[in-house]
Amino acid sequence: MSSVTGFYIPPISFFGEGALEETADYIKNKDYKKALIVTDPGIAAIGLSGRVQKMLEERGLNVAIYDKTQPNPNIANVTAGLKVLKEQNSEIVVSIGGGSAHDNAKAIALLATNGGEIGDYEGVNQSKKAALPLFAINTTAGTASEMTRFTIISNEEKKIKMAIIDNNVTPAVAVNDPSTMFGLPPALTAATGLDALTHCIEAYVSTASNPITDACALKGIDLINESLVAAYKDGKDKKARTDMCYAEYLAGMAFNNASLGYVHALAHQLGGFYHLPHGVCNAVLLPHVQEANMQCPKAKKRLGEIALHFGASQEDPEETIKALHVLNRTMNIPRNLKELGVKTEDFEILAEHAMHDACHLTNPVQFTKEQVVAIIKKAYEY
């Protein structure tokens, strides 16, 4: 096996207020003529996609819009967006939103050059050609999809989420302008922020972690610990929103290169089965999966190290677990899977599907099916 480690991030990332204008100028200077904006009904309703459309049109581009992306984008969303792209013969894709819009846009951009069905690319690096250039404008501080090589698309017929992990879907430009997040509701701030925290922790205990991903993960945890609750309490707190932009990006740098674990492997199944918010699923599962991971000595030590970043006086993995539960309660995250409407009769199939999700491969413990079911049961009854 090769000992070479790759490190993947977008070639260019813009941060700070004014990043939207900077991105529009950059696109103009690249001499692109036709763009497809991919977004969701909420972003369209508040006028942000229209604002970006106007910026691009003022710079000489013809712009088409697909604004029907669902919270858990599915195959139909990808197909419909691709149809709009082909009708206009778009050269680039501009995604505006959180993970859902970015994931849908990545899938569209990938199929535009590679053809076939999106399910053909499930797994790791299954494509042969680079996707169309993607400019990912972020409106939440959580998924980091604006800068990763991960795309998650729901197959509603099979009730699963397909994990497409492919270097070719990495956006060309990632954009984090905190002003686009000032209006984010508290519940969404919490869910997306806890998604970012999950990225940090899963990457830090991952079997594929390295010194670079470790540094990103720990700094991400520091910023989240300092600023997430502040952003939750006051959405217009500029410093908190800016810190969370950097935190979620650092989290993305960590998991984009160290990958994830069973929190995400299970959360994908909950989203596929019940259409639940991804960040909320992660938040509920995170302490229980990490508690189970403590049977791995290295993971246990690392979870102890994380406790220091939550303000503990000494390395203690139990303090990390406690801190995660406290953070959930502080931001009114549902206590358990039962409150989310998960059904006990689905435990077995959820576990089976999670064990086929690519994210489980780098979990520090390779659980048996019975152990996965036990984790689900504990998260259900807690």
Curated annotation (Swiss-Prot):
PROSITE patterns, per database record: ADH_IRON_1, ADH_IRON_2
EC number: 1.1.1.1
Induction: Induced by transcription factor ZAP1 in response to zinc deficiency.
Catalytic activity: a primary alcohol + NAD(+) = an aldehyde + NADH + H(+); a secondary alcohol + NAD(+) = a ketone + NADH + H(+)
Protein name per UniProt: Alcohol dehydrogenase 4
Residues of the signal peptide: none
Other remarks on this protein: While ADH4 is expressed at only low levels in laboratory strains, it is often highly expressed in brewing strains.
Description of how the protein assembles with itself and partners: Homodimer.
One annotated GO molecular function: metal ion binding
Function: Reduces acetaldehyde to ethanol during glucose fermentation. Specific for ethanol. Shows drastically reduced activity towards primary alcohols from 4 carbon atoms upward. Isomers of aliphatic alcohol, as well as secondary alcohols and glycerol are not used at all.
Top-level EC class as recorded in UniProt: oxidoreductase
Subcellular location: Mitochondrion
Family label: Belongs to the iron-containing alcohol dehydrogenase family.
Cysteine pairings via disulfide bonds: none
Regulation of its function: Inhibited by EDTA.
